[in-house]
C-alpha cells in the first residue's frame, strides 16, 4: 500500500523560481490548447468539469491553508478528501474557493468543523507549513502541479501516473 502525503504549496512562487508562467501570461496557442486538453481529460476520466470555471484564476492560498489545517487536525487522508472536494467545487460546481463562506461550506459538507478549520488555517503555524512546503518544492525542482515524488524522483502531471505506478512496481 502506498501512502500519499499531500503538501500544498504556493505555485506562484514555484513558477517564479522555475521559469513557469501563470496562465494569463502564456502564449495564446498554449492557452487554447490547455482548454482542449482539459476537455479531453474530463471526457477520458468521465469527470464533469467546466474547462473555464467562473472563479478561475483565483488565489488558491486560503484553500491550500485549509487543506494544511485539516491535515494537522485530522490527518492526511482527511486532507486528501478535502482537497478533492475543493477541486470539485471549483472545476465542477463553479464555486469560489477563495471565499471563506464557500470554504466553510465545503469543509462542513466533508463532516468537518468548517468555521474552526478556517480559523486554524489563518494561524502562523499553518502559514509556516505552507511556506515550508513551498520552499521544499522549490528545492526539489518542482515546476508544476500535480507533482509526485517517489524515492526522490519527481513525476509531473496526471498523465505521468503510469510511470509512477511502474516505479512502485519496480521496487
Identify the residue ranges that each predicted region occupies.
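Structural alpha/beta surface segment adjacent to cysteine/selenocysteine redox centers
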Residues: 1-90
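C-terminal cap of thioredoxin/glutaredoxin-like
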Residues: 1-7, 72, 81, 85-171
Amino acid at each position: 500500500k502506498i501512502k500519499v502525503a499531500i503538501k500544498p504549496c504556493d505555485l506562484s512562487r514555484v513558477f517564479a523560481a522555475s521559469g513557469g508562467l501563470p496562465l494569463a501570461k502564456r502564449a495564446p496557442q498554449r492557452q487554447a490548447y490547455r482548454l482542449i486538453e482539459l476537455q479531453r481529460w474530463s471526457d477520458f476520466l468521465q469527470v464533469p468539469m467546466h474547462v473555464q470555471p467562473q472563479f478561475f484564476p483565483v488565489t488558491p492560498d486560503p484553500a491550500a491553508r485549509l487543506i494544511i489545517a485539516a491535515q494537522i487536525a485530522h490527518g492526511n487522508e482527511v486532507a486528501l478528501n478535502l482537497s478533492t472536494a475543493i477541486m470539485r467545487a471549483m472545476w465542477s460546481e463553479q464555486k469560489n474557493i477563495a471565499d471563506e463562506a464557500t470554504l466553510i461550506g465545503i469543509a462542513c459538507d466533508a463532516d468537518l468543523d468548517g468555521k474552526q478549520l478556517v480559523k486554524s488555517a489563518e494561524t502562523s503555524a499553518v502559514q509556516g507549513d505552507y511556506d515550508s512546503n513551498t520552499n521544499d518544492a522549490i528545492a526539489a525542482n518542482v515546476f508544476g502541479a500535480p507533482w509526485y515524488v517517489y524515492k526522490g524522483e519527481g513525476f509531473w502531471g496526471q498523465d505521468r501516473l503510469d510511470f509512477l505506478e511502474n516505479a512502485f512496481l519496480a521496487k
